[in-house]
């Protein structure tokens, strides 16, 4: 059964979960895993060690951090990040919603899903019978970008769908890109100067990297 899990802090969604934060944590993590092997996850905004710090609060880069939660900024600085990572520095990420959901979710296998890796994350879970798609939403308010992101991933999944997934799939049959581009999450990012992140985040299947969250080590590692 393929289900949509919204109440991630209150009960176990299922044995296998795909966390979806299109704008932008899932997209940023997937982008990072296209050229490094692991990303540490934290909910803290403090800097405690020599590392590459990436993060935002309410869309804005955290003061003193190396980079914001911006996939296009990450790509623009790919060589710098990769060199520092290969020289032994950890990459540490914190975001308003996505990292909080990862920390609180109770599932045995937690994958990182986005529009940019939709078919690849679906492939990663193809051997599991029951899969929960977990939209992060925006500070506990409904975010249509994450709902549609779940639908885009569900297109590549086989199995019986619950009613929420069916609704998300129905949206993907129409002009779903415009819905995301005009969403409140997208408008907020545009107002902060991150319009390129929004257009990047809707590039379906543009990155073949998939991350899996290792909760005991507080990090996402490249699955494939």
UniProtKB/Swiss-Prot annotation:
Catalyzed reactions per annotation: (2R)-O-phospho-3-sulfolactate + H2O = (2R)-3-sulfolactate + phosphate
Protein's name according to its UniProt entry: 2-phosphosulfolactate phosphatase
Highest taxon of source: Archaea
Temperature dependence: Optimum temperature is 75 degrees Celsius.
Pathway(s) it belongs to: Cofactor biosynthesis; coenzyme M biosynthesis; sulfoacetaldehyde from phosphoenolpyruvate and sulfite: step 2/4
Cofactor(s) named in the record: Mg(2+)
EC identifiers of the protein: 3.1.3.71
Keywords attached to this entry: Coenzyme M biosynthesis, Hydrolase, Magnesium
Gene Ontology biological process: coenzyme M biosynthetic process
Oligomer and partners: Monomer.
Function field: Hydrolyzes both enantiomers of 2-phosphosulfolactate. Able to hydrolyze both enantiomers of 2-hydroxycarboxylic acids with pseudosymmetric centers of inversion. Specifically hydrolyzes (S)-phospholactate and (S)-phosphoglycerate.
Family: Belongs to the ComB family.
GO molecular function: 2-phosphosulfolactate phosphatase activity; magnesium ion binding; sulfopyruvate decarboxylase activity
pH dependence: Optimum pH is 5.5.
InterPro entries: ComB-like (IPR005238), ComB-like_sf (IPR036702), ComB_archaeal (IPR027639)
Activity regulation remarks: Inhibited by vanadate.
Species for this entry: Methanocaldococcus jannaschii (strain ATCC 43067 / DSM 2661 / JAL-1 / JCM 10045 / NBRC 100440) (Methanococcus jannaschii)
